[in-house]
């Protein structure tokens, strides 16, 4: 009998849904030090905000969970707020997944319930003596994010993939930068980002450090399905640009980015000598 294998932590003896570890992702912080006093790293802007995806998938349990729905809506970009008001659910679902025929079966099963909940909110409902609809809920959120979340390239492991293999593959999928374009710094312990999301799920992101061999152009490749279905834009950012672009509630993300820059500024010459 084949031993149970967990595709989250990579250990045997249990399966993914019984794993006690946080949801694990692996990525690479790739830096360019060709201008020593202006070191930059690769950052990506998500195609869709996390909260936007959660809302369309109906992850608020009930349309009467007003506070949580408003929290999700408050983290939409300006474009996402306009999009969700202007389109019906089927169009939004198609835009979200793009290739709907290849959606994970588990996500595909969410479609009917998600659509019903969305339409109930959009059409309007009464709760505790007050009327709500999607337009009014959005109008009660005053955030004006001009972009979606910026973050470090990362992702979850494939079956039987080790941590480093996962990081290299996910980084290439999201950036189009292959492992031949950079050196992984093997004598540096990966940086860890760990937090609990607003959905009360624990996450842990493990980032290896890579140094680009020579500056390379960053762009969205429309031939790379793994990239254009998840990434809206990609850029080289210095420390100040990272802190400006990362949203204020993502303090855990800012922390790991600043830890990286502080470490590199102190140790980059030693790294280059090894």
PLM features: residue spans?
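Short Cys/His-rich zinc-binding micro-motifs
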Residues: 3-14
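Unchanged
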Residues: 59, 72-75, 92, 96-265, ...
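E2/UBC-UEV (E2-variant) core
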Residues: 60-84
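Short beta-strand scaffold segments in enzyme catalytic cores
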Residues: 26-30
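Short, charged/polar surface micro-motifs in flexible loops or helix N-caps
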Residues: 35-36, 48-51, 213-217
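Cysteine-centered loop/knuckle micro-motif
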Residues: 16-20
């Amino acid at each position: 009998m084949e031993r149970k294998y967990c595709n989250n932590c990579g250990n045997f003896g249990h399966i993914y849904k019984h794993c006690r570890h946080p949801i694990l992702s692996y990525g690479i912080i790739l830096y360019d030090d060709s201008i020593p006093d202006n070191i930059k790293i690769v950052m990506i802007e998500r195609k869709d905000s996390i909260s936007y995806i959660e809302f369309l998938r109906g992850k608020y349990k009930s349309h009467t969970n007003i506070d949580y729905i408003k929290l999700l809506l408050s983290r939409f970009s300006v474009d996402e707020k306009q999009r969700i008001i202007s389109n019906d659910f089927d169009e939004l679902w198609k835009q979200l997944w793009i290739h709907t025929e290849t959606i994970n079966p588990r996500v595909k099963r969410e479609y009917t319930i998600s659509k019903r909940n969305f339409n109930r909110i959009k059409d309007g409902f009464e709760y505790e003596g007050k009327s709500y609809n999607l337009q009014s809920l959005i109008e009660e959120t005053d955030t004006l994010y001009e972009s979606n979340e910026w973050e470090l390239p990362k992702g979850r492991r494939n079956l039987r993939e080790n941590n480093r293999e996962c990081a290299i593959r996910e980084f290439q999928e999201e950036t189009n930068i292959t492992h031949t374009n950079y050196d992984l710094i093997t004598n540096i312990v990966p940086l860890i980002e760990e937090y609990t999301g607003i959905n009360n799920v624990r996450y842990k992101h493990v980032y290896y450090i890579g140094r680009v061999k020579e500056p390379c152009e960053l762009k969205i490749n429309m031939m790379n399905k793994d990239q254009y279905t998840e990434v809206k834009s990609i850029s080289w950012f210095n420390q100040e640009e990272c802190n400006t672009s990362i949203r204020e509630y993502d303090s855990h993300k800012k922390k790991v980015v600043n830890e990286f820059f502080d470490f590199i500024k102190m140790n980059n010459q030693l790294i280059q000598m090894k």
